[in-house]
């Protein structure tokens, strides 16, 4: 049997602890909404497709019929809701003694971890962008040299043309921007990726200095004549994202490599307008917090529960490099 907590401390009750946890969650600013579209849903399963596109208008005679666009569904991704939980327990003796403040700290930390877990789970897509799994609907990694087109047209890529994974630099980023821009829809229609919106350079903390120097220096880095910095004029938003780094990949079992430096050289160039069309975070609701006491064991529990689905229905608006100088062929 479980009942609400009682305590000599008025705030150390189920409602009081839940209030602590809710307040702590509000203090955390998640990163994933900068890259993903956050949607609410009531569906257990939900399918989404990649961009097929509508063709441009054709010139016709004044009384001619309108050319009808061919309907084509792109590659599919199924969003399946998953449940995430964590709880902590504290004995009554600890609550009655001078460890009261630890109860408060731990309950707040649990709530913060719930908020952070959304970032951890969402950015697994980027941590595994070059790996064998998961593959997006076309059967390829998120970053690939051979994304097939649904209409059977020539395969496309969203990394360097020769597959060499160049390190982050002023010139290499321009080459990657060329790759980002030169894309066609699944019907072979040119898409205006990277042309009409602000770009985002997403890096691990390892690359933070190089990224900020590239994006914000007045002159071109490394030049003596202080020529105008293209990237500052381009107005690139730098996102230093710890959740795409080695330590999170290793913690989540996504890599067995112990070469942290090599892993953290990776970086991504995004057009958020298009990236948010294919990157979705679908939640049933905001995560729940609960606190209670078992009146038999006198053990106090606090629990968080979250239900959401993360996925990607396409790769348009996303380009990337491992940055380690290897040749990538996937």
What residue ranges belong to the model's regions?
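N-terminal alpha-helical "arm" segments
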Residues: 1-29
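Sequence/fold signature of self-assembling virion shell proteins
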Residues: 2-6, 143-186, 195, 200, ...
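Assembly/oligomerization interface modules of large self-assembling protein complexes
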Residues: 22-84
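Intrinsically disordered or highly flexible coil/loop and linker segments, enriched in small
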Residues: 26, 30, 37, 41, ...
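Short active-site-adjacent helix-start/loop capping segments
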Residues: 53-55, 96-98, 307
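Catalytic micro-motifs at enzyme active sites that drive phosphoryl/nucleotidyl and oxygen chemistry
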Residues: 72-78, 122, 187-189
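Long, contiguous amphipathic alpha-helices that act as assembly "spine/axial" helices in icosahedral shell
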Residues: 77-134, 201, 302-304
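Internal, conserved structured core segments that host functional sites
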Residues: 125, 129-148, 169
């Amino acid at each position: 049997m479980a009942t609400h907590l009682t305590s000599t401390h008025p705030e150390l009750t189920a409602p009081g602890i839940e209030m602590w946890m809710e307040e702590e969650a509000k203090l955390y600013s998640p990163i994933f909404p900068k890259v993903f579209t956050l949607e609410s849903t009531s569906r257990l399963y939900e399918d989404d497709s990649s961009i097929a596109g509508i063709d441009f208008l054709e010139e016709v005679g004044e009384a001619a019929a309108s050319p009808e666009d061919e309907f084509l569904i792109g590659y599919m991704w199924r969003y399946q809701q998953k449940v995430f939980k964590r709880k902590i327990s504290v004995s009554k003796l600890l609550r009655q003694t001078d460890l009261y403040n630890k109860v408060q700290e731990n309950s707040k930390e649990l709530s913060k971890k719930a908020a952070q877990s959304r970032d951890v789970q969402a950015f697994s897509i980027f941590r595994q962008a070059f790996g064998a799994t998961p593959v997006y609907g076309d059967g390829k990694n998120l970053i690939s040299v051979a994304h097939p087109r649904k209409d059977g047209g020539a395969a496309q890529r969203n990394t360097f043309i020769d597959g060499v994974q160049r390190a982050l630099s002023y010139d290499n980023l321009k080459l990657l921007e060329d790759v980002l821009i030169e894309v066609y829809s699944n019907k072979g229609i040119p898409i205006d990726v990277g042309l009409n919106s602000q770009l985002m350079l997403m890096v691990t903390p390892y690359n933070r200095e190089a990224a900020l120097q590239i994006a914000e220096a007045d002159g071109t880095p490394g030049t003596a004549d202080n020529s105008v910095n293209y990237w500052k004029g381009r107005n690139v938003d730098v996102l230093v994202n710890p959740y795409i780094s080695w330590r999170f990949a290793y913690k989540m079992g996504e890599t067995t490599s112990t070469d942290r430096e090599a892993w953290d050289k990776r970086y991504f160039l995004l057009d958020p307008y298009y990236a948010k069309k294919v990157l979705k975070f679908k939640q049933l609701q905001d995560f729940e917090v609960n606190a209670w006491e078992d009146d038999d064991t006198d053990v106090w529990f606090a629990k968080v529960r979250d239900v959401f689905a993360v996925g990607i229905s396409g790769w348009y608006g996303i380009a990337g490099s491992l940055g380690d100088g290897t040749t990538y062929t996937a």
